[in-house]
């Protein structure tokens, strides 16, 4: 469950390390984001000489959450951190690598490019 002011780890190689959620995209007044939801965030920590700089406002898709997500078959899934991948306006990832596992829920939301870059899909 990601809401405004939540700090997330950036799980790609765009140069950003930490970001803060400033808006959950969707219907008006939407409060929380879960796996596969798109958010707008600001980069709080970044590596030098990389495409994404500190204080850049970026779109990202949530790939891991600490909050438990229940699947239709009854299985519950939970991760150790809140993580996101920075995307462009077309929905494609800006980086060329994704670090760590991603949830299967991204495939249902048509983020297949992120699924193909991920080392493990849970």
UniProtKB/Swiss-Prot annotation:
Q: Name one GO molecular function term.
A: structural constituent of ribosome
GO CC terms in record: cytosolic large ribosomal subunit
Q: Give the record's GO biological process terms.
A: translation
Q: Which SUPFAM superfamilies match?
A: Ribosomal protein L14 (SSF50193)
Please explain the role this protein plays, according to its UniProt record: Binds to 23S rRNA. Forms part of two intersubunit bridges in the 70S ribosome.
What the record says about family reads: Belongs to the universal ribosomal protein uL14 family.
Write the protein's name. Large ribosomal subunit protein uL14
Lineage in the entry? Bacteria, Bacillati, Cyanobacteriota, Cyanophyceae, Synechococcales
